[in-house]
């Protein structure tokens, strides 16, 4: 089987996630991803069965309810700005 996920892709994803992986970790992740994809390929071999769904979504009507006003919602916020929650900068 050819590698469905290669080491370069794993390094790229790790870089995006700001994870440091050494060569051994990358090889391990490549092997694990290959194993996972093989299991999904096996699922394609399972025959489909015509069956009625056992679960049904239960929908309820939307109901208007009282909510917090802006001052109450911001009352416990550690920091606010211009009537909104303020969080730390993310770079």
Swiss-Prot record:
Q: Which HAMAP family match?
A: GatC
Q: Which InterPro entries match?
A: Asp/Glu-ADT_sf_sub_c (IPR036113), GatC (IPR003837)
Q: What does this protein do?
A: Allows the formation of correctly charged Asn-tRNA(Asn) or Gln-tRNA(Gln) through the transamidation of misacylated Asp-tRNA(Asn) or Glu-tRNA(Gln) in organisms which lack either or both of asparaginyl-tRNA or glutaminyl-tRNA synthetases. The reaction takes place in the presence of glutamine and ATP through an activated phospho-Asp-tRNA(Asn) or phospho-Glu-tRNA(Gln).
Enzyme Commission number(s) from the entry: 6.3.5.-
Provenance organism: Halobacterium salinarum (strain ATCC 700922 / JCM 11081 / NRC-1) (Halobacterium halobium)
**Highest taxon of the lineage:** Archaea
Pfam families reported in the protein's UniProt record: GatC
Residue span of region Disordered: 68-91
**PANTHER family given in the database record:** GLUTAMYL-TRNA(GLN) AMIDOTRANSFERASE SUBUNIT C, MITOCHONDRIAL (PTHR15004:SF0)
Recorded family membership = Belongs to the GatC family.
Q: Which reaction is recorded as catalysed by this protein?
A: L-glutamyl-tRNA(Gln) + L-glutamine + ATP + H2O = L-glutaminyl-tRNA(Gln) + L-glutamate + ADP + phosphate + H(+); L-aspartyl-tRNA(Asn) + L-glutamine + ATP + H2O = L-asparaginyl-tRNA(Asn) + L-glutamate + ADP + phosphate + 2 H(+)
* Entry keywords, A to Z: ATP-binding, Ligase, Nucleotide-binding, Protein biosynthesis
Q: Provide the GO MF annotations for this entry.
A: asparaginyl-tRNA synthase (glutamine-hydrolyzing) activity; ATP binding; glutaminyl-tRNA synthase (glutamine-hydrolyzing) activity
Coiled coil feature spans? none
Listed name of the protein: Glutamyl-tRNA(Gln) amidotransferase subunit C
GO biological-process terms attached to the record: glutaminyl-tRNAGln biosynthesis via transamidation; regulation of translational fidelity; translation
Q: Give the quaternary structure.
A: Heterotrimer of A, B and C subunits.
């Amino acid at each position: 089987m050819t590698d469905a996920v290669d080491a370069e892709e794993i390094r790229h994803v790790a870089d995006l996630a700001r994870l440091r992986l050494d060569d051994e970790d990358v090889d391990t992740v490549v092997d694990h991803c290959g194993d996972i994809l093989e299991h999904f390929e096996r699922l394609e071999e399972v025959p489909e069965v015509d069956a009625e769904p056992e679960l049904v979504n239960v929908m309820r009507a939307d109901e208007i309810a009282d909510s917090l006003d802006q001052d109450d919602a911001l009352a416990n916020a550690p920091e606010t700005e211009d009537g909104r929650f303020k969080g730390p900068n993310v770079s």
